[in-house]
Amino acid sequence: MSRYTGPSWKLSRRLGVSLSGTGKELAKRPYAPGQHGPNQRKKLSEYALQLHEKQKLRHMYGVNERQFLRTFNDAGKMNGIHGENFMILLESRLDNLVYRMGLARTRRAARQLVNHGHVLVDGSRVDIPSYRVKPGQTIGLRERSRNLTVVKEALDVNDFTPGYVSFDEEKLEGTYTRYPERSELPAEITEALIVEWYSR
């Protein structure tokens, strides 16, 4: 299944969660798009709830179905709780950590920075958004990329860096210091429903 490339605000309203991370999509109209959006009160079946939760998390991180399933299977090989490990692996993606460090305003913008070769991991260029960063690795920008307008604009509005990431504004370089705790990950996701979906 290909990655969704349409308007993020429309998908955010349909899924009921801000995919950009800004919350602006739901500020004025926190309901599904369309004529009947404000009045939709349909009770979802268990199947529909599981599918909805899967789609919500998949689109939140901007991952296609094949990558999503591969990451889910990798999480199942780890010690601990499958659902939590799954979310930790998604959070460890390079594009996501570029976003978390404030170098991009959205995950989609972060993915473009990585794709276009602007991002370094431990001093070496990495252009694979799904690259899995390990705790202790550093993430920065190439010298010529530090003056990009999109980066400057992102840094101007960023006012929060999660506890599992450190960031040096002078060097425009950050470190993935540790894996996140579940309490530090998106609270609007019920990962147990996703585990149930793939366990059918």
Curated annotation (Swiss-Prot):
GO terms for molecular function: rRNA binding; structural constituent of ribosome. It comes from the Bacteria. The keyword ATP-binding does not apply. Disulfide bonds: none annotated. Keywords: Ribonucleoprotein, Ribosomal protein, RNA-binding, rRNA-binding. InterPro entries: Ribosomal_uS4, Ribosomal_uS4_bac-type, Ribosomal_uS4_CS, Ribosomal_uS4_N, S4_RNA-bd, S4_RNA-bd_sf. GO terms for cellular component: small ribosomal subunit. It holds the Pfam family Ribosomal_S4. GO terms for biological process: ribosomal small subunit biogenesis; translation. Residues 92-155 form the S4 RNA-binding domain. One of the primary rRNA binding proteins, it binds directly to 16S rRNA where it nucleates assembly of the body of the 30S subunit. Part of the 30S ribosomal subunit. Contacts protein S5. The interaction surface between S4 and S5 is involved in control of translational fidelity. Belongs to the universal ribosomal protein uS4 family. NCBIfam families: PRK05327.1, rpsD_bact. This is Small ribosomal subunit protein uS4.
